[in-house]
Amino acid sequence: MFQRRKLFSRASAMVALSTAFVAGWFKSDARAQGGYTVNQQAMIDLFQKHVDAEMKGDLETTMATMNDNPHLNHVPTMAGGVGREGVRAFYRDHLVGKFFPPDVKMASISRTVGDTQVVEELAISFTHTTAIDWLLPGVAPTGKSVEMAVAVIVGFKDGKISHEHIYWDQAGVLVQVGLLDPKGLPVSGAESARKVVDPTLPARKI
């Protein structure tokens, strides 16, 4: 059985990301809306702990939330790791404490909770002032503003996180940092993410 929670519907719902915000966004929605099973709430709480540890740069706690054979895949760039050592090495070298530049803002658009996974739909914005290895590997900071819609699929097995699959529109990101010219191509930039936040914005004319 799946439960979907609509959390924010307008760009005005965007809030500045902080450790306190990340630590609270999962619990606050579930408790406000109600209706999650004990197992579903346990998955939400564990993922909350996982993200909070990532933002704090706490590698040991991050890994403690994962099972014995996890995998992590940032789908557009194929960045991540397989197995505890592979995932641990990726977190240590490229992610924990290096997630986003300091001005990042994040809003949860929706959440879908099943029996073995949580799917979080997010709108994220930031200025590309630091290297972001998982998103733009090998690309030096451009100073450009970026807005992106992100879907995070988190799997659970035996009470721990078994995998994370993270999806976003990489073409849109490349357009915004100046690495892809959208002229003549069926791609969009920041407006694509904005329409996820506000579905009433005009669709592309075809």
Predicted feature locations:
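C-terminal and inter-domain tail/linker signature
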Residues: 2, 10-18, 25, 31-206
